C-alpha cells in the first residue's frame, strides 16, 4: 500500500521515537508521550530526551495516568501556529494536547481543494483544525462533534485565529450525517476522523469496524460530484484493505486512493499513523 508521508512545520517537530514513546516539540514546549507504534529503539537515549522535555505523560495503570513535569514552571496550556491559524493546546488526561499534527497533509489537501463558494463539513471534528483550514479559504464550514467541551475548544481556536461564522453542531456525527442525507444536503468537501472506539452520551458503544460501512454509505450521498472526502482510520481492526474494499463499493466510479499515513522523526525514525482514504476529482 502507498505510504503518504506527512511533515512537521516551524511550530511542530517529531524529534524522536522509540521504546513505546515519542518526543515532540510544540512551539517551545517539548513533550514525551506513549506511542504504541514506536516499538523500535529510539535514535537518542531517553536520558537525552529528559534533558530537553518539559512534560512526560506516564501511564501508571490500566485506568490511571499522569502528566509529570520535568521542567519547573512548565506551562499546562500554550498556543502554536500553523500559517495564520492559532491552535490552543493544553494537557489532557488522555495524553493528547488538542491537536493531531500528522493531519497536516490533509489540511494542505483541504486548502488546495476549497474556495469561497464551497460548502465543507468536518465530522468527529475534535478541536477543529480542519474546520479552521476550511474556513480560512472562505468556505461555508460546518463542524460536528458530540463532545460539548471540544466544540468550546474549537471555538477558542477560531477566535484566536481571527475567524468567525463556523457553524457548530453538538451532535452524534453519524446521526447528523444521516439527517443531512434525508434533507438532501450535499458538500464540496467532507472530512471524517472517527475514533476507533468509544462510549456515547447515552452509554452506547462505538466500534469503528461496525460503523464504517454506514459512514461511507452516507458520505457517498453527501459529497457533490466534484467534491472530495477524507477519511482517517486508526483502529487495528480496520486495515487498509478493508477501507479499500469499502471505498470500491461506494466510490468505484470515482477517483480514490487509500494510503498509510507516516511521519519521519528528525532523527530518521518512521512512525505509522493509520490509514487515509481520499476520494476526489482528478
Stretch-by-stretch model annotation:
Residues 127-139:
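Conserved SAM-binding loop of SAM-dependent methyltransferases across substrates and taxa
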Residues 228-282:
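C-terminal catalytic and target-recognition region of SAM-dependent MTase-like enzymes
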Residues 117-126:
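Conserved class I S-adenosyl-L-methionine
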Residues 140-145:
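Conserved SAM-binding motif I beta-strand of class I
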Residues 8-24, 31-99, 108:
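Non-catalytic substrate-recognition/targeting regions of SAM-dependent transferases
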Residues 173-252:
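S-adenosylmethionine
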Residues 101-116:
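Conserved alpha-helix/loop element of class I SAM-dependent methyltransferases that forms part
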Residues 146-191:
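S-adenosyl-L-methionine
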Amino acid at each position: 500500500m502507498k505510504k503518504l508521508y506527512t511533515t512537521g512545520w516551524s511550530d511542530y517537530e517529531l524529534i524522536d521515537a522509540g521504546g513505546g514513546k515519542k518526543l515532540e516539540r510544540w512551539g517551545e514546549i517539548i513533550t514525551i508521550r506513549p506511542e504504541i507504534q514506536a516499538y523500535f529503539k529510539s535514535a537518542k537515549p531517553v536520558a537525552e530526551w529528559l534533558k530537553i522535555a518539559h512534560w512526560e505523560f506516564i501511564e501508571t495503570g490500566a485506568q490511571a495516568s499522569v502528566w509529570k513535569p520535568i521542567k519547573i514552571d512548565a506551562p499546562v496550556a500554550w498556543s502554536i501556529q500553523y500559517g495564520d491559524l492559532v491552535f490552543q493546546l493544553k494537557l489532557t488526561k488522555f495524553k493528547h494536547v488538542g491537536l493531531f499534527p500528522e493531519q497536516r497533509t490533509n489540511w494542505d489537501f483541504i486548502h488546495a481543494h476549497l474556495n469561497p463558494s464551497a460548502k465543507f463539513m468536518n465530522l468527529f471534528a475534535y478541536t477543529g483544525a480542519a474546520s479552521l483550514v476550511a474556513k480560512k479559504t472562505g468556505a461555508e464550514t460546518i463542524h460536528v462533534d458530540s463532545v460539548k467541551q471540544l466544540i468550546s475548544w474549537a471555538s477558542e481556536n477560531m477566535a484566536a485565529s481571527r475567524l468567525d461564522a463556523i457553524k457548530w453542531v453538538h451532535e452524534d456525527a453519524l446521526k447528523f450525517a444521516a439527517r443531512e442525507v434525508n434533507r438532501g444536503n450535499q458538500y464540496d468537501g467532507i472530512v471524517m476522523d472517527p475514533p476507533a472506539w468509544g462510549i456515547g452520551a447515552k452509554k452506547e458503544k462505538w466500534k469503528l469496524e461496525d460503523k464504517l460501512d454506514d459512514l461511507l454509505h452516507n458520505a457517498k450521498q453527501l459529497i457533490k460530484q466534484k467534491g472530495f472526502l477524507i477519511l482517517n482510520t486508526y483502529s487495528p481492526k480496520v486495515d487498509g484493505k478493508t477501507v479499500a474494499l469499502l471505498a470500491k463499493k461506494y466510490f468505484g466510479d470515482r477517483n480514490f486512493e487509500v494510503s498509510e499515513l507516516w511521519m519521519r522523526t528528525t532523527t530518521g525514525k518512521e512512525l505509522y499513523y493509520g490509514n487515509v482514504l481520499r476520494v476526489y476529482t482528478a
